[in-house]
Amino acid sequence: MANKTVKVGLVQLSCSGNVAENMEKTIAGVRTAAQKGAQVVVLQELFRSLYFCDVEDYENFKLAEAIPGPSTETLGALAKELGVVIVASLFEKRAEGLYHNTTAVLDADGTYIGKYRKMHIPDDPAFYEKFYFTPGDLGYKVFQTKFAKIGVLICWDQWYP
């Protein structure tokens, strides 16, 4: 098997409480990464909002969405336009009362390939993630994309290989 190089771009933003503004900043970041040659663009954890898990507030559940859903549709169209793979962490509403910290993978043709749900959920001062997220149930996943096979972990999962 021949070695090949895949250029990865990372988008890290300063988020606000405005979801639409954060999405626009993210789209701009993905465009910049693609212009610089990135083939795979990875977004920060829960990029659509401020990090809300530092407080327990039922209002924050309004930030959750279905996956696939509005954000994956927007990002899928962007992936197709730019010909890049996008790896995006989203607050998933699976069903009423059932929420996950989930990463969606969108291929370079805009296709939604699948998702990974964070399995290890911290609960420490300023990290009240168990208030919001149910542990993932999909196992560790590897996604075949146009450019590479991609395995996904979210934050604390890295400590449990």
Predicted regions and their residues:
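Hydrophobic positions in the central parallel beta-sheet of the AAA+
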Residues: 9-11, 41, 151-153
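Short, basic, glycine/proline-bearing loop/turn elements
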Residues: 11-17, 57-63, 147-150
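Active-site catalytic loop in hydrolytic enzyme cores
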Residues: 65, 77, 94-161
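Short, glycine/acidic-enriched loop or turn micro-motifs at the edges of active sites
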Residues: 15, 48, 160
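Residue-level recognition of beta-strand->loop/alpha-helix junctions
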Residues: 12-14, 44, 117
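Cys-nucleophile CN-hydrolase/nitrilase-fold catalytic domain and related Cys-dependent amidase chemistry
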Residues: 19, 28-108, 115
